[in-house]
A protein has these predicted regions:
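Conserved P-loop NTPase "ATPase switch" module shared by AAA+ and STAND
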Residues: 1-16
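Structural recognition of the conserved hydrophobic beta-strand(s) that form the central parallel beta-sheet
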Residues: 6, 30-36, 57
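Conserved catalytic/switch belt of AAA+ P-loop NTPases
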Residues: 17-33, 46-47
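Interdomain motor-coupling "hinge/lid" segment immediately C-terminal to the ATP-binding subdomain
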Residues: 36-38, 43-143, 179
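Short, polar loop motifs at secondary-structure junctions
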Residues: 38-43, 292-299
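Accessory nucleic acid-recognition modules appended to NTPase machines
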Residues: 98-258
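Active-site ExK catalytic segment of metal-dependent nucleases
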Residues: 257-268
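Domain-level recognition of nuclease-like catalytic cores that cleave nucleotide substrates
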Residues: 296-317
Length: 317
């Protein structure tokens, strides 16, 4: 019978890498470790363990897992709760009431910011860090650059260089609070140097401090939920740029598989329909294409080979 060793929060053990190397050399057991990114990032494991490990990144709950944890059926209210409260497993121990859940999430958020970002990265301008995190949360799914943020801040009499903005954004990424999505040319898949998008790792952490206005935020939440779904399915996710300034919300690649996705709240008028379906129709290949929305009556249809899906159905693919 094989032997297993499980060690939680291994970064609290001084010199843990020496012990692990000795155990590896003895070949006496399979070792499973967890660590907080406050003091140990995955990029450092290769130094500590000389590459002799397999890393598993643990994400928050998917939508189906959220339903299962909370013993819910898929419904309009369940989807709203998912978009509002996010995917952290501990929420299973709390009533899904905004005041209670957001208080818990604010504590988690503060811990991440103070331990995983400020302490680890040696952040000196904490006020700016919090402002940048809030700005990123309010601009989920929007194209922006560090240079533009720096210029905006200077117009508000806040002197932060482009390099400082880049470093602070990277610190938020290193703490797994936000994720960067690169922009590519749809035709040639050339990666652009500027014009990235950022999405939160957890919707609840995005909402708890910024304040949630569902009517104002719904498009952002839909896009963030789609990104999380694709990431959990191990796709490499990009946003696409087409000729004439047209945009594809998501290009997702996994091995030889490619899918294109447009996201919107509802098909309110013909202009919206033309934008969402028209951009996908302009892509001349045979990879799957989706328009994802909250339309109840038209979701499930197929227009010129493009699948129109309700968000709840897409998140269960």
């Amino acid at each position: 019978m094989p032997n297993y060793l499980f060690i939680d929060e291994i970064q609290d053990i001084a010199g843990f890498e020496h012990t692990l190397r000795s155990l590896q050399a003895s070949d006496s057991c399979d070792i499973f470790i967890t660590g907080s990114n406050a003091t140990m990032l995955s990029s450092e494991l290769s130094t500590y363990l000389s590459g002799r490990y397999i890393e598993f990144r643990i994400s928050s709950l998917s939508y189906p897992e959220f339903l299962n944890f909370h013993h819910l059926d898929s419904s309009t209210q369940s989807l709203r709760d998912y978009l509002t409260f996010g995917e952290l497993p501990y929420l299973n121990n709390l009533p899904l009431q905004q005041e209670i859940v957001f208080e818990y999430l604010r504590n988690v958020y503060s811990t991440i910011m103070l331990k995983d970002v400020v302490k680890r990265e040696g952040i000196r301008n904490v006020d700016f860090l919090e402002t940048l995190a809030s700005y990123t949360a309010d601009n989920v799914g929007c194209l922006f650059s560090a240079n533009n943020i720096s210029k905006y801040l200077k117009s508000q009499h806040v002197n932060m260089s482009t390099l400082q903005v880049i470093n602070y954004l990277r610190a938020l990424q290193n703490a797994f609070l936000i994720n960067k999505v690169r922009r590519v040319d749809v035709a040639g898949l050339k990666v652009f140097e500027i014009g990235d998008k950022y999405f939160f790792e957890d919707l609840g952490l995005r909402n708890c401090n910024l304040g949630l206005n569902m009517q104002h935020d719904i498009n952002k939440l839909i896009e963030n939920a789609i990104f999380l779904h694709l990431s959990q399915k191990h796709y490499e996710v990009f946003t696409g740029q087409m000729s004439g300034g047209r945009e594809i919300d998501f290009i997702a690649r996994r091995n030889d598989e490619v899918i294109y996705i447009q996201a919107t709240y509802i098909m309110a008028d013909e202009t919206t329909r033309q934008r969402e379906f028209g951009n996908l129709e302009a892509i001349r290949d045979n990879y799957p294409k989706y328009v994802v929305s909250l339309d109840e009556w038209t979701s499930g249809s197929c227009v010129n080979g493009i699948n129109h899906m309700h968000l709840a159905d897409f998140l269960r693919l």
